[in-house]
Amino acid sequence: MNSGAMITLSVDAEAEQDRLKTTINWGNNTDVTYGGKLATVARFSKTKGRSPILQADIDILPTEVVLNDTLWNIRSSHVAIDSGRVYIDNFLFERPGQYLRVDGKITKEETDSCIVDLKNVDVQYVLDIVKFDDVEFGGLATGKVFLKNILNKPDMKTRLNVHNFAVNKGLMGEADIKGVWDNELPGIRLQADIEEKNLSSTRVTGYVSPKLKALDLRIEADSTNLDLLTPYFEGIFSELDARANGLVRLHGGFKTLDFEGGVRVKLDTKVDILNTYLQLHDDSVYIKHGEFALKNARLFDREGNSGRVTGALRHKHLKNLTYH
């Protein structure tokens, strides 16, 4: 969501004896609508004994939510809170052909678990939550996330398929993603295998840490689509059609990302300042902190004329590109 958007929020609460009915309404003022209502009825009680503990039984009522102009339904479900333990009974957030379902126990016990079940959920919804908005992701995720011991030493494993996985609107293919929570980071260690059928394959390994707001990913490219770089080259190149083979590391804070490594590139693109199209047929691009460099590379135009070039595109964390 646009960070400059205005969000309106209202909370209505009605208490009667040991019962509390709460309704939360929210909305925004942007061209794309985010808004809706969450309604609950909570009943409170205390355990018996010398040190009574507050317990809560919460009924989640059916309501509607709009995300990115799309209507979703919150279905009836139940949550119980008892002695620091949370029991979730079939929370369901859905629309035709898509859903997010949560069921299980959130406790300090190693034997208790919670399952998050996804079907065709837009991956950008998830990344919006952790404020990772410098890179735009797309695709529909299906699979399960298994959670254990959440309130003590979290244990998380996931296996997701992402249909039409895209980065900065550049289609990467079908993604098979495996993830495991690492308490030492803390963050998610992942392996993603991404394939465009009969075109390319890409393997990504490394970690993403929402807490540190940082990532470190090793990218093994085999004819990988480079459309994902289009936003960073705006004003210099346009109509980019490029694929790469090689090894690249993407690392840094979410706001201070950088690349290093080396790839061989096939490229056809318009150089805006020259108003002409240039090509690399299969040449090396050398990548280091703040720089993409060519060394005596052969460039072609679309008529087959060629010449040699040595130069570099320099940047500051993928912003403010200049060429030398």
Which sequence ranges carry the predicted segments?
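Interface amphipathic segments
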Residues: 1-324
